[in-house]
């Protein structure tokens, strides 16, 4: 390996980054080495990595299905070229714009930006400007919009076929509205009415046309809410063997009360199902029933053939108390089905870019796996994308994954090489199948899903606390 030196060893806020770089270097190159520089540039020549530490996932596992039978490897280009794999039950969406008073032209322009939905997810956007709602961008906004939504005239359009889009001012005016949690309040209200919600969209994103860049991501998330699937792995390697779960828990920075969330996944066409998000004290009361339903669904799908293992994805920095709780809930099931714990961590903050100096962007191709220790791996899930026009280069930072068997006594044991290979392929496909971002979400689908469940629940909890304090 080689190290690019820019200056002496850093100190202060860069010390932790420097130590992390040294740790990664030591794990990948046991013979030794040093790292320095600020910003940190670390070159790991893959040709110098011992063969048993370097693996490559086959190209067939990178293939995604779009439309009826089209196959692509890039989510954005595949969705824009072929459309969704499994359209939702909606064939048209009635858009209702919630816009600042005096910004009707901006709302009309935003409506026009939604026109590609017809080709992306087989949904035709329609709307009636007479039913759009203008609001004053001040402290009255929440009350005005809440009253307007509750008193909207009855129409023939089912609630599930209506989409509400919140447009907010740019700059300080938007900050004031968000400080009053306007978007959170409206999302909760709209979802309680059985409709769909997108927001908050700033005016500058509408006027500059920047929203068009994000429309494929918005479209893919909308389609999932409508019961469809924007794309899925052409052949999911673990479909007939593994029951998969994602687990997340809240942090004190999100809310004082602790919440936990879990979801289950097996068939790509079904996506995440049997979601559960509860306060930690109540979570254990519902977990067993959700797991039982997911297990029975697997048996139904596979003619009473049970899963060979349960793979649980969680964050690597999961608090110790939450990890112990997860282990306590899972141990009773380890006798019925082997449990594999996959702890993942995004490495984007480590700023380690120069893994392969001879490759485009100094990044190895998607599907590259670098073994750090017996149970820890660096998994590259996306290819480097160079800068194009106004778009910056996309560096696909690797996902750090720690894989262990959960034993009946609560201890963790490393997987065999063959078992680890199977779970790494599964994690690779779950990252690529994630509809949260067409340009590549760095987390497996199930973990991104539980993070979103948890984030929305914590936002609602904060809103409930704020309203309670205001009433007192």
Language model regions located:
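Extended, highly charged clamp/arch subdomains and adjacent linkers
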Residues: 1-204, 462, 466-472
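Long, contiguous domain-sized segments
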Residues: 126, 133-140, 148-472
């Amino acid at each position: 390996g080689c190290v690019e030196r820019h200056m002496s060893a850093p100190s202060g806020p860069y010390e932790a980054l420097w130590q992390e770089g040294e740790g990664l270097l030591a794990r990948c190159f046991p013979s030794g080495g040093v790292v320095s520089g600020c910003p940190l540039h670390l070159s790991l020549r893959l040709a110098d990595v011992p063969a048993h530490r370097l693996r490559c996932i086959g190209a067939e596992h990178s293939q995604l299905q779009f439309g009826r039978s089209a196959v692509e490897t890039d989510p954005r280009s595949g969705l824009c070229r072929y459309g969704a794999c499994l359209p939702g039950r909606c064939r048209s969406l009635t858009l209702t714009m919630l816009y600042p008073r005096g910004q009707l032209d901006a709302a009309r322009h935003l409506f026009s930006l939604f026109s590609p939905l017809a080709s992306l997810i087989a949904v035709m956007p329609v709307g009636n400007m007479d039913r759009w709602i203008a609001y004053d961008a001040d402290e009255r906004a929440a009350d005005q919009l809440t009253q307007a939504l509750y008193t909207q005239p009855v129409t023939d359009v089912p609630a599930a076929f209506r989409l509400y889009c919140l447009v907010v001012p740019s700059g300080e005016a938007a900050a004031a509205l968000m400080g009053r949690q306007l978007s959170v309040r409206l999302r909760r209200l709209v979802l309680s009415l059985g409709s769909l919600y997108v927001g908050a969209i700033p005016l500058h994103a509408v006027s500059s046309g920047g929203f068009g860049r994000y429309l494929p991501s918005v479209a893919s998330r909308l389609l999932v809410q409508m019961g469809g699937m924007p794309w899925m792995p052409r052949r999911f390697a673990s479909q007939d063997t593994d029951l998969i779960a994602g687990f997340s828990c809240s942090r004190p920075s999100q809310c004082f009360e602790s919440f936990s969330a879990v979801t289950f996944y097996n068939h790509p066409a079904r996506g995440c199902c049997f979601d559960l998000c509860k306060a930690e004290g109540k979570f254990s009361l519902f977990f067993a029933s959700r797991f039982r339903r997911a297990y029975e669904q697997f048996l139904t799908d596979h003619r009473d053939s049970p899963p060979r293992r349960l793979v649980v994805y969680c964050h690597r920095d999961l608090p110790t108390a939450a990890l112990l709780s997860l282990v306590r809930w899972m141990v009773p099931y380890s006798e019925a089905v082997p449990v594999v714990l996959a702890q993942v961590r995004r490495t984007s903050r480590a700023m380690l870019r120069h893994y392969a100096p001879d490759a485009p962007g100094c990044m190895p191709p998607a599907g590259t796996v670098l073994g750090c220790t017996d149970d820890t791996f660096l998994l590259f899930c996306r290819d480097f994308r160079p800068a194009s026009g106004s778009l910056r280069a996309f560096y696909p930072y690797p996902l750090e994954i720690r894989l262990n068997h959960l034993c009946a006594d609560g201890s963790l044991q490393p997987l065999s090489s063959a078992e680890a290979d199977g779970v790494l392929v599964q994690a690779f496909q779950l990252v690529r199948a994630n509809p949260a971002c067409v340009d590549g979400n760095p987390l497996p689908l199930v973990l991104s899903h539980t993070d979103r469940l948890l984030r929305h629940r914590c936002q609602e909890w904060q809103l409930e606390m704020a309203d309670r304090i205001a009433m007192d």
